[in-house]
UniProtKB/Swiss-Prot annotation:
Binding site for [4Fe-4S] cluster 1: 20, 62, 65, 68
Cited SUPFAM superfamilies: Fe-only hydrogenase
Keywords: 4Fe-4S, Iron, Iron-sulfur, Metal-binding
InterPro entries per UniProt: Cytosolic_Fe-S_CAF, Fe_hydrogenase, Fe_hydrogenase_lsu_C
Binding-site positions, [4Fe-4S] cluster 2: 214, 269, 456, 460
Name this protein carries in UniProt: Cytosolic Fe-S cluster assembly factor nar1
Function: Component of the cytosolic Fe/S protein assembly machinery. Required for maturation of extramitochondrial Fe/S proteins. May play a role in the transfer of pre-assembled Fe/S clusters to target apoproteins.
UniProt family annotation: Belongs to the NARF family.
GO biological process terms held by the UniProt record: iron-sulfur cluster assembly
GO MF annotation list: 4 iron, 4 sulfur cluster binding; iron-sulfur cluster binding; metal ion binding
Keyword Iron-sulfur carried by entry: yes
């Protein structure tokens, strides 16, 4: 464990402060009804209290402030949860979609403002968690989620309007876009200087490039280690990219506003709710006609909340048909080219444990560069623990072509960012020379071309929103007749060994995802298949930009910012005076 790691760093959530430091300057205006008599005198004891609207601080405000919230999981559960999904399904009428027997979709009339099209994106880690819970294959877990979200025996079987999700997407498909662009980003960094390059708001990252798909890591970096921000990859995560992809294409092909498309993401991590609430991830980034920004991902729920979603509608997940839906409930995407990309089983390749449980960014980049250097080999060296692994791509002559690393867990992340921290310039005479001599050790992390960084130890299959062992026991116990002994089993505490065994089951389900698919007869991905996927992905990226008329950078890139707190700092007297004047105008004061 790092010597500077304190107990406070082990839990990065701080309860919201009693007094939010964000000033509220839009005070409600006093209601002066026309029937009131201006000359009437009312004694103080007869004055009726005014029902003023409560002050609201949005999650976007919290993300722009480091005063009280550093990990908003507890707050987000009430803002983005299974209850919000059900309330939204009941609050809006279904869009007038006509789906034929063969799955072709058309719109019968103009979609009204109060009507919605519902789309969901599901991560492979969620399917793995569900597969381990009910002891089924990852493929059947996908069918289970499909049947729940858009099948006739799922959410459509209840609610005010009988709403369900029209499309359920696999984020693995969008992940292939991110992998292709990440490999390109690293290649460009290897052939340029260490300084940031590029123009506009999307500046190319410096080496070592740090992955930016983990929102817990991003929140931590923005608030505590701004010196690593120039190293963060510009790419959106698969979740964010799926929201942009769905809303930009559907709004264009169906001629509707992005606000009429409601996008749900089912993820393994509570911090993904933070990511969905970022002001950078709205249609304002890629749409020129957006007056009021609409989030690309409207709601995020976790694997555990998926169980709660089914329980709220009294739906037994194991009782659902574990098979593909009929075309009437699984329509084609309006655009044939996009439909082929989203729902083709040949888009993603089989991944081994070498890829890791967080999308395989690092190993994919290594394989592509290995393909460019015939005869090269990948050497693996374990770090101080199992969550730190260093990789070296070596040539035939035993020369290092590139180095990369994997850092999982905040304990290891702190060691990484400490290595990358720039050395302070000393004022002592002759100190600069000694500092330069020792700069290699302090900047050893800069030898990497790419670092895959994830906040959770073990990767995304161990996300905070995944189904726990006791949750799985309770879910399975509810399938049988409850007895006193059974209830005792579900409430007993599990050991560390049992927890590790449970995580191993989830990992096994994750890595066996493709082995039980319809294409299991196909061999594992080779260099040529990786090259083919690269070509298909670049073709669909070009098609996407042509279809929407947006720049590719605006569709796939995002930005990050340094978050500073005003707590403990001298406040601007002018601002304080202005707020006091506003308070005085409504009869208040300090």
């Amino acid at each position: 464990m790092s010597a500077i790691l304190s107990a406070d760093d082990l839990n990065d959530f701080i309860s919201p402060g009693l007094a939010c430091i964000k000033p509220v300057e839009n005070f409600p205006q006093k209601n002066t009804a026309s029937e009131e008599n201006a000359y009437e005198v009312t004694t103080e004891d007869k004055i009726q209290p005014e029902n003023q609207a409560p002050t609201q601080i949005s999650l976007t405000d919290c993300l722009a402030c480091s005063g009280c919230v550093t990990s908003a999981e507890a707050v987000l559960i009430s803002l983005q949860s299974h209850a919000e999904v059900l309330n939204t399904l009941d609050a809006h009428r279904p869009a007038p979609l006509i789906i034929t027997q063969d799955g072709n979709l058309s719109v019968s009339r103009k979609i009204e403002p109060d009507e919605r099209i519902f789309v969901a994106s599901v991560s492979p880690q969620v399917r793995a968690s569900l597969a381990a819970t009910y002891d089924i294959s990852e493929r059947k877990a996908g069918h289970m989620i499909d049947q729940l979200l858009r099948g006739p025996q799922g959410l459509r079987n209840g609610g005010k309007h009988g709403n369900g999700f029209t499309w359920v997407l696999d984020t693995n498909v969008l992940r292939q876009m991110v992998l292709t662009l990440a490999a390109q980003e690293v290649t460009e960094a290897l052939h340029t200087s260490s300084a940031s390059s590029g123009s506009g708001k999307y500046t190319s990252p410096k080496k070592p490039i740090l992955s930016s798909a983990c929102p817990g890591w991003i929140c931590y970096a923005e608030k505590t280690h701004p010196h690593v921000l120039p190293h963060l990859s510009r790419l959106k995560s698969p979740q964010a990219l799926s929201g942009t992809f769905v809303k930009s294409i559907l709004s264009r092909t169906l001629g509707i506003a992005p606000s009429q498309i409601w996008h749900l993401a089912v993820m393994p991590c509570f911090d993904k709710k933070l990511e969905a609430s970022r002001e950078e991830l709205t249609d304002a980034a890629w749409s020129n006609i957006s007056d009021s920004p609409v989030r690309d991902v409207d709601c995020v729920i976790t694997s555990r909340e998926l169980l709660m979603l089914a329980s709220s509608r009294n739906i037994s997940l194991p009782s659902l048909p574990l098979k593909s839906l009929a075309p009437t409930y699984a329509p084609h995407f309006p655009d044939p080219t996009v439909d082929s990309f989203l729902f083709s089983h040949t888009q993603t390749s089989k991944q081994s444990s070498k890829y890791g449980t967080s999308g395989g960014y690092l190993y994919y980049i290594l394989l592509l560069h290995k393909e460019k250097h015939p005869g090269s080999r990948i050497e693996v060296q374990r770090g101080r623990n199992s969550d730190v692994i260093e990789y070296s791509l070596m040539s035939e002559t035993n020369e290092a072509i590139m180095k990369a690393a994997r850092y999982y867990g905040f304990r290891n992340i702190q060691n990484l960012v400490r290595k990358m921290k720039p050395a302070r310039a000393s004022r002592l005479p002759g100190a600069n020379r000694r500092g330069a001599a020792g700069s290699g050790a302090s900047s050893s992390g800069l030898d990497y071309a790419f670092v895959e960084v994830m906040a959770c130890p073990g990767g995304c299959t161990n996300g905070g929103g995944q189904i726990r062992l006791d949750d799985a026991r309770e879910a399975n116990a509810s399938l049988h007749s409850a007895t006193p002994n059974d209830s005792a089993v579900t409430t007993q505490k599990h050991t560390t060994y049992e927890q590790r065994q449970w995580l191993s089951r989830v990992d096994e389900a994750y890595f066996s995802a493709e082995s039980d698919s319809e294409d299991e007869a196909k061999p594992a991905a080779t260099g040529s298949s990786l090259h083919d996927m690269e070509i298909r992905t670049r073709d669909i990226l070009q098609y996407w930009t042509n279809l929407t008329g947006a720049q590719l950078e605006d569709l796939v890139y995002t930005t990050f910012r340094k978050v500073e707190s005003d707590v403990g700092k001298d406040k601007n007297v002018n601002d304080t005076t202005r707020v006091a004047e506003l308070a005085g105008k409504i009869g208040g004061g300090w």
